[in-house]
From Swiss-Prot:
Pfam families: Mur_ligase, Mur_ligase_C, Mur_ligase_M. InterPro entries: Mur-like_cat_sf (IPR036565), Mur_ligase_C (IPR004101), Mur_ligase_C_dom_sf (IPR036615), Mur_ligase_cen (IPR013221), Mur_ligase_N (IPR000713), MurE/MurF_N (IPR035911), UDP-N-AcMur-Glu-dNH2Pim_ligase (IPR005761). This is UDP-N-acetylmuramoyl-L-alanyl-D-glutamate--2,6-diaminopimelate ligase. ATP binds at residues 116-122. Belongs to the MurCDEF family. MurE subfamily. Its main location: cytoplasm.
């Protein structure tokens, strides 16, 4: 594709030399070290470093031109031979150029975007599952992986950056996908990563405290999430949780004809449930929808999973799926790795062990409340908090575990570059003196100790890391999987 054709999509680019107007762009790179002959380098400003400052490395590697911010040009002025193009809006420039280069793949798929603090991963998996059951080829992009039939790749971000995102969408189109289901993070919306993606369905699950190390406050966090439902992104219907305060605000802000609300108990919502019966292996009841009512049996436990189920049902109903087909598929849903995932080494195991990704105050509370009815003995919670992240949620999480669990093991999560002991102290600040938690900084030892100390009938909840198979210590990522450590401890326990 010619450079002038790409830049025609961007109104904030200046100073394109005429000699380069017909230059052929072979690829787009945002990493200067990855550039090769014929590539276009887009240097994105970051929170710590402006990637545009590395344009000399990109040009030296063969890039035909570099698009960078005015600040990067000022800090590292180009010499005569280097073609450096300045853009006042790098976010929009990158997204627009990437979408154009890959042939606007988002327009060739029916896209579903799911945003919210909690529930994105389960909801997107449910939507993908229902579409697949209807024999509709679907691409899934989210926290765990990007996948479609015949392809799977571990994810590095909940929502890929613009160039990678457009490339993956194009690959999905080429693979024959008709639908794309995407977790859309607040970071992605604030940074414009999904510009150029017209969503047929936008889902809002909830908003609770998280990412306040990035967003200035909850209103800023909400404003980022709400972008998904602006005309720039949403072309079809919004599916919004009416049980959430921020969801109620969104419902009021949008045109009623564009919204389907959902609620587990409120019959005034467009989608709701009745006749709920909670059983050891899931929930049964009736789902009420604008397309009719249907009985269902779900293997998922917890009210929050009923909310996720309603959101997914609403999304695929709007996409044209048959309600009875959806209901027939629900009992077959296999679940999501690291989300209320049971760890079992034999069917006669005398304790239950559950691994879950809960890493916010709200999700941790939901996990503990959902697990309680299925644990006849004591509920033991092993948890920590991530380093270099919002410190204010740590004492809140400590308080929640102190109130809802019978025994608390406070340990490390991903401390990153922060002092692990300071993280533990922040958590302990929320635990009242009347509760005596066990504090073990080494997560592997904490898991082993909790499982070995458990008595028959107890349940051990390993919260915070879920599907993750790594731990970040300093700047190093080491292999660590809660499920592996749990199995090892369960095996040791059987030999006692």
């Amino acid at each position: 594709m010619k450079l002038r054709e790409l830049l025609a999509t961007v109104d904030s680019v200046e100073n394109l030399p005429p000699v380069l107007a017909d230059a052929e762009v072979k690829g787009i790179k945002t990493n200067s070290h990855a550039c090769g002959a014929g590539d276009l380098f887009i240097g994105m400003p970051g929170t710590r470093v402006d990637g545009g400052e590395f344009w000399p490395s990109a040009i030296a590697s063969g890039a035909i031109a570099a698009i960078v911010s005015p600040q990067a040009v000022e800090k590292n002025p180009p010499h005569d031979e280097a073609v450096v193009i300045s853009s006042n809006n790098m976010t929009k420039a990158c997204a627009a150029i990437a979408a154009a280069f890959y042939g606007y793949p988002g327009q060739k798929l029916k896209l579903v975007g799911v945003t919210g603090t909690n529930g994105k991963t389960t909801t997107t998996h449910l939507i993908e599952f229902f579409l697949t059951k209807a024999k509709l080829s679907t691409a899934l992009m989210g926290t765990l992986y990007t996948r479609w039939p015949g392809f799977e790749q571990t994810a590095t971000h909940t929502t890929p950056f613009a160039v990678e995102l457009q490339q993956q969408l194009a690959q999905a189109v080429n693979a024959g996908c008709e639908f794309g289901v995407m977790e859309v993070s607040s970071h992605a919306l604030a940074q414009g990563r999904v510009l150029g993606c017209p969503f047929e369905v936008g889902v809002f699950s909830n908003l609770t405290q998280d990412h306040l190390d990035y967003h200035s406050d909850m209103e800023d966090y909400f404003a980022a999430k709400a972008l998904l439902f602006s005309p720039e992104y949403l072309k079809g219907r919004a599916i919004i949780n009416a049980d959430d305060t921020y969801g109620q605000r969104l419902i009021k802000a949008l045109s009623p004809e564009k919204v389907w609300s959902y609620s587990v108990n409120d019959s005034s919502a467009d989608l709701w449930m009745s006749d709920l019966s909670y059983e050891p292996n899931g929930v049964t009841g009736t789902i009420h929808t604008p397309e009719g009512n249907v009985s269902f049996r779900s293997p998922l436990v917890g009210q929050y999973n009923l909310e996720n189920l309603l959101a997914a049902v609403g999304a695929v109903l709007h996409l044209g799926l048959n309600l009875q087909l959806i209901a027939n598929a629900i009992p077959e849903f296999p679940g999501v790795p690291g989300r209320m995932e049971r760890v079992q080494i034999n069917p006669d195991q005398d304790i239950s062990v559950i691994v879950d990704y809960a890493h916010t105050p709200d999700s941790l509370e939901n996990l503990l409340k959902a697990a309680r009815p299925f644990i006849p003995g004591r509920m033991i919670c092993v948890f920590g908090c991530g380093g270099d992240r919002d410190r204010t949620k740590r004492p809140k999480m400590g308080k929640i575990v102190a109130e809802l669990a019978d025994l608390a093991f406070v340990t490390s999560d991903n401390p990153r570059t922060e002092d692990p002991d300071r993280i533990l102290d922040d958590i302990l600040a929320g635990i009242p003196d009347t509760v005596q938690p066990t504090v073990i900084g080494d997560r592997a030892i904490a898991i082993r100790t909790a499982i070995l100390q458990a008595q028959p009938g107890d349940g051990v909840l390993l919260a915070g890391k879920g599907h993750e198979d790594y731990q970040i210590l300093g700047t190093e990522k080491i292999h660590f999987d809660d499920r592996e450590h749990a199995r090892a401890a369960l095996t040791e326990r059987e030999k006692l």
